[in-house]
Design a protein with these regions (language model features):
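Adenosine-phosphate binding glycine-rich loop
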Residues: 161-162, 178-184, 285-393, 400-403, ...
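Rossmann-like adenosine-cofactor binding region
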Residues: 237-306, 311-313
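N-terminal ligand-binding/catalytic initiation module
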Residues: 1-158, 398-399, 406, 432-456, ...
């Protein structure tokens, strides 16, 4: 580690507060009543319920989502036996990973005890606190004994990640690697360097899946492990001891090996050894920070080799974060009493299968130009793949149920998967009613920027979820090339249609129709022809206008108002409406908030604001939410006579005439809109109850400023929109920062709007 990295790491751990974790309350503690419920006397009620039924602890406490990361510091991350206290930063780091990737809370516990039996007694006594135990950085062979005894004594999952996490990921990699080179697990020969916890667990798991034990040769620091090599050999080693054939070194046994599994130290495997391996060898060089052989060195003598390491700077990283958060997620969610072989194997297969799936846009963004299509350089998923939790946790949970170790079986697996998806995509629950309705009658949606990577990823999602029938505008050769480069599994003409923006036989009809619409607005025939050829939003809008598509999504490239101008000119406003407006939804920890008008009208009149307010309320109801509207101003219920304040008061009168059933009040300050007690101090008889969820701003400046401040200030907040309201056809103009998920969400909303369009 160089000095700069060392200092950066020290600063990272020290500032702004020491360490990486904290405890945050999940219940309010703002009033005397809150304290009475959280502690004495109210806390007695759940205590008595748990006394009657111990399983009630999962209902009334955090036990069901709490894991202990426990270590004695005897084998810390390549640092060796540095002691329990010195290992604490690692254990805190493990806790951060549990929380980040699976939403699991962690207490890190460092036990200053080297005697295995005493250590076991300490850990076993902690069972009432936790839903699971993650043993970490405990040296072999004691780790095997400790885990086995704790599994026997405890009625919650006990999992030594250094063993089983590495084994699960390595096994998934080997299964996929053998698939790439067309070899069978039962036929291949494997040489192993290292006989510690990870190596033994890897071999055990591979044998459980069908690798033949007689095809495995293990080398430790003394050389080949053969029968009767030494008296009192550890049972874990003896299980893999081979007959003595005179071979003593790694170099002696590597000849013809299909797989090298390294869980030992740097530079153990030489290029000369790699040369002697079988056709298309697999090399898992997992020592950290320096592997048994560096991939470029191995590739220099064997281009056909498939190589995995524990490092992030090479392809095929064997990283335990691919496994442990999600195997615990599945185990906790069914109240598993153990993590058994069936659950581990389920995780292996789920991880292996995910590598065959199309590329995730999150992974593509994180790893730049790397080719992440299944093949020699991509046989296991990347740690940042958001689908890991959705694939692995349900597989593990189901295996726990099928093998009889689940105390709280999941009754509705579809609902469970939806819940896990919400962890990945925070908009999932919010969009659920829209998605359900869109799936019922998928419509043709034209995406104007069809060559964009985000649009292509969104198209994959739309097909996978069954939300729409996409039509992409773009050059077919470019679209096909980018689909292949992005590792997507969609096909033009099968999953979606392409409209070639450079040459389409319908273009003469398109520009003629566009000219007919625009000829009295200063557009010549020549300009109409040029617009159709050069502007994909014009093409998409004309397609919807002609009935060749049901809805349009545009704006992922370019200026919002340029796109809006096109759709407004071609479609006009819907019946009974004389303006358009844009609304953004913010999904915040405190609740969902809708803000309008965020894009269209710079300084709307009272009449325009009234129309926007009514349309906003209609749109909010599509999400299954009852709108509570506040008209915002610097004025609070008549405190100012300014023109801006009067505008909002006039808006209130107009809205009450047009939508008397709508819960609305104003004009008011922002804090009064969100906090009922503040509002009641000024207007105790306000018809607006609770916190307002629809905020109508006096102008676009106030709307955009408020939206962006809320969006950025809440690190956990996510957005949906902008939702375009008032245009005669289902169309939404997005912005260049739109994510793949935002595109998917807006397509689904456009489909639902198209379903209700008059024929």
């Amino acid at each position: 580690m160089d000095d700069q990295l060392r200092q950066s790491a020290l600063d990272f751990h020290q500032f702004p507060v020491p360490g990486k974790i904290q405890v945050s309350p999940t219940k309010p503690l703002a009033t005397q009543r809150d304290l009475a419920l959280a502690y004495s006397p109210g806390v007695a009620a759940p205590c008595l319920e748990i006394e009657k039924d111990p399983l009630a602890a999962y209902k009334y406490t955090a036990r069901g989502n709490l894991v202990a990361v426990i270590s004695n510091g005897t084998a810390v991350l390549g640092l060796g036996n540095i002691g329990a206290l010195a290992g604490k930063p690692v254990m805190e780091g493990k806790g951060v990973l549990f929380k980040k990737f699976a939403g699991i809370d962690v207490f890190d516990i460092e036990v200053d005890e080297l005697d295995p039996d005493k250590f076991i007694n300490v850990v076993a006594a902690l069972e009432p606190t936790f839903g699971g135990i993650n043993l970490e950085d405990i040296k072999a062979p004691e780790c095997f004994y400790i885990e086995q005894k704790l599994r026997e004594r405890m009625n919650i999952p006990v999992f030594h990640d250094d063993q089983h996490g590495t084994a699960i990921i390595s096994t998934a990699a080997i299964l996929n690697g053998l698939r790439v080179v067309e070899k069978n697990l039962s036929d291949v020969r494997m040489v192993v360097s290292g006989a510690g916890a990870a190596a033994i667990a890897c071999m055990n798991l591979l044998v459980a899946l069908g690798m033949q034990k007689h095809n495995i040769v293990v080398c430790d620091s003394k050389g080949v492990i053969y029968k009767d090599r030494e008296p009192n050999m550890a049972e874990t080693k003896a299980a893999y001891a081979v007959e003595d054939d005179g071979k003593r070194t790694l170099d002696d046994v590597i000849d013809g090996a299909d797989i090298f599994l390294g869980c030992s130290g740097p530079k153990v495997l030489t290029p000369e050894m790699v040369k002697k391996m079988a056709r298309a060898p697999m090399i898992l060089a997992l020592a950290n920070p320096e592997p048994e052989i560096l991939p470029p060195l191995a590739k220099s003598v064997r281009e056909d080799a498939i190589i995995c390491t524990g490092r992030s700077d090479y392809p095929n990283q064997v990283n335990n974060v691919l496994c442990f958060p999600f195997i615990f997620r599945g185990a906790l969610d069914v109240g598993a009493t153990a993590i058994n072989e069936e659950m581990k194997l389920a995780a292996v297969h789920a991880i292996a299968e995910l590598a065959h799936a199309e590329q995730s846009e999150v992974v593509a963004s994180a790893y730049g130009d790397q080719d992440l299509s299944f093949g020699p350089d991509y046989i296991i998923p990347k740690p940042f793949d958001p689908r890991l939790i959705v694939k692995i946790a349900p597989a593990v949970a189901k295996a726990a149920m099928d093998s009889g170790v689940a105390t709280r079986p999941i009754e509705d697996f579809d609902a469970y998967v939806d819940k896990l998806t919400e962890f990945v995509y925070k908009t999932n629950l919010f969009m659920k009613p829209i998605f359900s309705q869109a799936r019922a009658d998928a419509k043709r949606v034209v995406l104007a920027e069809g060559e964009e990577a985000r649009v292509l990823h969104a198209t994959q999602e739309l097909i996978t979820l069954g939300l729409a029938k996409p039509i992409l505008i773009g050059r077919p050769s470019v679209i096909e090339m980018r689909i292949q480069k992005l590792g997507l599994q969609i096909k033009a003409g099968v999953d979606f249609e392409i409209v070639n923006n450079e040459s389409d036989p319908r273009f003469k009809e398109y520009w003629s129709e566009y000219y007919a619409i625009m000829k009295r607005r200063g557009i010549t025939q020549e300009q109409a022809q040029k617009a159709v050829i050069s502007n994909t939003t014009v093409i998409g809008a004309i397609m919807v206008h002609r009935g060749e598509a049901d809805a349009l999504i545009c704006g992922t490239v370019g200026d919002y108002h340029e796109h809006f101008s096109v759709v407004q000119e071609i479609f006009g406003y819907r019946d009974g409406v004389h303006t358009a407006g844009a609304m953004n939804a913010l999904l915040l920890p405190s609740g969902n908030t809708f803000i309008a008008d965020t894009y269209v009208n710079d300084d709307p009149t009272p009449e325009q604001l009234a129309e926007i307010t009514v349309m906003a309320a209609e749109t909010v109801r599509r999400f299954g939410i009852e709108p509570k509207v506040a008209l915002l101003s610097h004025s609070n219920f008549g405190s100012s006579k300014s023109a801006a304040a009067c505008k909002m008061r006039q808006t209130l009168e107009l809205v009450r005439e047009r939508a008397p059933e709508l819960m609305i009040d104003g004009e008011m300050h922002g804090d009064a809109a969100l906090v009922e007690s503040i509002r009641n101090e000024r207007m105790p008889d306000s018809p607006l109850k609770g916190s307002a969820n629809v905020l109508i701003m006096p102008n676009v400046e106030a709307a955009r400023i408020s939206y962006n401040l809320l969006r950025v200030s809440s690190s956990e907040g996510v957005t949906v929109g902008p939702v375009l309201m008032g245009v005669a056809k289902p169309v939404h103009v997005l912005t260049p920062i739109a994510s793949v998920r935002r595109i998917v969400n807006m397509v689904a909303l456009a489909v639902v709007e198209a379903q209700t369009q008059p024929l």
